[in-house]
Amino acid sequence: MKRFFAALVLVAVAGTALAQQGPKPEDMIKIRKAGFGFMAWNFGKIKANLDGNFNKDQVIAAANVVAATAGSGMGALFAPGTDKDVGDQKTRVKPELFQQPDRVKELMGNLSREANELVKVAATGDVAAIKAQFGKTGGTCKACHDDFRKD
């Protein structure tokens, strides 16, 4: 009986240790790409509404997704080991990103701030104001891409 409980404790401890390790670099790249891809798709929905038939509800919904994704802590997915291709996951991140954590934090903060402002402006339904804020929000994406994304 003691052996059983000792084995049970060992399994529990090992399981806890494995769970605390978090996702593997390959999985982090995959999740990161999915998150930014979903954000880009929602940016596209906003742009389509601004360029075509405007639907305030669609713009608000897409802006909320962008803001939620931007504020979700995706910066944690730029962890050690995710600076290069891993397994079948390719990354376009430049190695410099991992050497400038303060700049990355600043850029992610800018994205989150402008995306939250986009949500507020979208709620007004003012197309001109939404276009202006959409440009500011997209500019934060561009700033990061210019610094840290391979072409």
Regions found by a protein language model. Give the residues of each.
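Sec-dependent N-terminal signal peptides
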Residues: F4-V13
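N-terminal signal peptide c-region/cleavage motif recognized by signal peptidases
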Residues: A14-A19
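Sequence context surrounding c-type heme c attachment/ligation sites in exported
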Residues: G22, E26-I60, N64-D151
